[in-house]
Structure formats: structure tokens, C-alpha cells
């Protein structure tokens, strides 16, 4: 059985259209015109136990709305989602004991309490037995390295410390599923690496199923077993990082370093489809569709036109592929 099961999930919002001006405002108040906005459209996917799924899309794609339905905050218009065999909107008090949630821009910690006291309060909220609580704290201290600031008030913690503390809070009751929304937002490189290592260790040691939303594509490459991409509430890709690169990473770039003093123009590649040529001084970059053109032919032609000091092939990385998706180029 899948840990996360989503079938034909749909969420519509009804909004009032307001006309401009005083008359328009009065007319809208007396005779409001309603429009239905489809935020999530017929989403279907499953996540098996222990998988880390990168749930990604541009701003406004429907990610947050989907997460709110999966966590039980919003009720679907139609379709359903089931987490660990439970419907999130049914008996939420019991359901939330199966999940942990971290929102990168919001904290679940109490601002004026010491971090250790915050965990004690959460222990009571989640009915965590004393023996399990101490065992969990030992594990989370080791993985997330909380010991240096666990006695400090939450308001004094740095952003990186607070994020580690929030992840620990979400894992205190040993949830089966962890929802991470932008867990590395605003963090410096070294802190991001520490957070990623901690997430990987927790996933491997406890088989925690993780659904990750992020705009940091390094998170996706380093953490995710699979990517589920949506746009305008609909699925546009479901597969592994390697499948994404294989299917959509056909654009490659040949970068040439020219011997100085060559000022003649490039003529062979002008106007060719799926190829762009950019020359800046002694640097010549040719981007091309590798399913349409052979790199060996391009190199041969360029060597006949110019004296070359060096060259290298650059594959399209995941960040560029997803950027092209967002721009509707793929």
C-alpha cells in the first residue's frame, strides 16, 4: 500500500469579480458575479513508503493548495487523498499524529520559550510517552546537532538553528510522513548541506516518507528519488531526475576558447533551428539540440573555421531544464 495516495484530486475556489469605480463596487455588492478558479485539477499520484518526492512547480502552480489538502487543512472539491491509510479531513486529531509538517517561512515553535521547553510542550500535545520522548530527543540531537542551543529561547536562534529546531519538532512524535515546504530557504550553503544530510539520514534510518516542495534545485538533485512537477494545478512530469534529464535535457553546449586575433564572423550556423551561437571576444558558445545535430560535426566545422585553444561540452543541468518548463519552452 502506498504511504501517500492521491486520486483525481480537485480543488476549486469561488471568487467575486469586482468591477472598477463606485458604481461597479455597488453593483458587485448587490449583484455579485462569481467565478470558479480551479487551483488543482485532477491530480493522481502515489508515494511508496520511504521515498523522497520532490513536489515542484512555479509560483501559483497549486503546490501549496495540494499540500494543504494532504495535511487536512483544506477539503478537496472532488477526489480524495489518503495518507498512511487515513483520510486527512477525517478525525484530524488522530491523523496529525502520523505526519510532520515544516513550513520554511513559518515556525511551530514558541517564540519566548527555551527550545527544550518547546519540545516538552509538544510531547504533551502529541501524547509521546516519556521513554520514547527521551529516545527521540537523543536521536534528533545527534542527527540535527541541537545541543549547542537547545536551552536558548527560540527568539534568539539563527535562521539555520531555527530550521533544524523546526525539523526536530516535526519529527518528535516519529511521524510516518514528513511534509517539508522550502526547508532550506534563506540559508547559507554550509547550513543547507547540514540540513540535507540530516533529512537523508532520517529518511534512511527511519524510512520516513518525505514530500518536499522547494525552489532550490540543489535540494531536488541531492535529496529526491523522484520528481512530480505541476503547472496550473495539473501534472506535467512524473519521474526520476535522470529521466527528466534524458527526456528533456537534449540541449547541450559546446564552449570553445579561440586563439586571440581571429575577428572573422560565424556563418555556417546562422538561421539553423534548435541552435544558438554566442561569441564574446575569444569565447564561442554553441547551444544545440543533441537529437538533431552531432557534436562531432559541430566541432569539425568550428575547427575548420577557427584556431581553437580549448573546448568543453556542457550538458544541460536540472535547473536549466526546469527553468525551461516554467518558461513553457519544453
Give short role names for the model-derived ranges.
Residues 79-90, 95-96:
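Conserved ABC transporter NBD signature motif
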Residues 196-289:
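ABC transporter nucleotide-binding domain
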Residues 112, 153-157:
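Conserved ABC ATPase signature
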Residues 178-182:
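Catalytic Walker B motif of ABC-type/P-loop ATPase nucleotide-binding domains
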Residues 21-29, 120, 124, 131-149:
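Conserved ABC ATPase "signature" region
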Residues 174:
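Conserved catalytic motifs of ABC-family nucleotide-binding domains
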Amino acid at each position: 500500500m502506498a504511504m501517500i495516495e492521491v486520486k483525481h484530486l480537485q480543488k476549486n475556489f469561488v471568487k467575486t469579480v469586482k468591477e472598477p469605480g463606485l458604481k461597479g463596487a455597488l453593483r458587485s455588492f448587490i449583484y455579485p458575479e462569481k467565478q470558479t478558479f480551479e487551483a488543482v485539477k485532477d491530480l493522481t499520484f502515489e508515494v511508496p513508503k520511504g521515498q523522497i518526492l520532490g513536489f515542484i512547480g512555479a509560483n501559483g502552480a497549486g503546490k501549496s493548495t495540494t499540500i494543504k489538502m494532504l495535511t487536512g487543512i483544506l477539503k478537496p472539491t472532488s477526489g480524495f487523498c489518503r495518507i498512511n491509510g487515513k483520510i486527512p479531513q477525517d478525525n484530524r486529531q488522530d491523523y496529525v499524529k502520523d505526519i510532520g509538517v515544516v513550513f520554511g517561512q513559518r515556525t511551530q515553535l514558541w517564540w519566548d520559550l527555551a527550545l527544550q521547553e518547546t519540545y516538552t510542550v509538544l510531547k504533551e500535545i502529541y501524547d509521546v510517552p516519556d521513554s520514547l520522548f527521551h529516545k527521540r530527543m537523543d536521536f534528533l540531537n545527534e542527527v540535527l546537532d541541537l545541543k549547542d542551543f537547545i536551552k536558548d529561547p527560540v527568539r534568539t536562534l539563527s535562521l539555520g538553528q531555527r530550521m533544524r529546531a523546526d525539523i526536530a519538532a516535526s519529527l518528535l512524535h516519529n511521524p510516518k510522513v514528513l511534509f517539508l515546504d522550502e526547508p532550506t530557504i534563506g540559508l547559507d550553503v554550509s547550513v543547507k548541506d547540514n540540513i540535507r544530510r540530516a533529512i537523508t539520514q532520517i529518511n534512511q534510518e527511519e524510512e520516513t516518507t518525505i514530500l518536499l516542495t522547494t525552489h532550490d534545485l540543489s535540494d531536488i538533485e541531492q535529496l529526491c528519488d523522484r520528481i512530480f512537477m505541476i503547472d496550473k494545478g495539473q501534472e506535467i512530469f512524473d519521474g526520476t531526475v535522470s529521466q527528466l534529464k534524458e527526456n528533456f535535457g537534449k540541449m547541450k553546449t559546446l564552449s570553445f576558447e579561440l586563439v586571440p586575433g581571429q575577428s572573422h564572423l560565424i556563418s555556417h550556423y546562422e538561421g539553423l533551428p534548435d541552435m544558438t551561437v554566442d561569441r564574446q571576444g575569444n569565447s564561442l558558445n554553441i547551444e544545440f539540440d543533441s537529437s538533431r545535430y552531432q557534436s562531432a560535426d559541430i566541432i569539425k566545422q568550428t575547427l575548420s573555421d577557427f584556431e581553437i585553444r580549448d573546448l568543453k561540452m556542457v550538458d544541460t543541468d536540472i535547473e536549466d531544464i526546469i527553468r525551461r518548463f516554467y518558461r513553457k519552452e519544453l
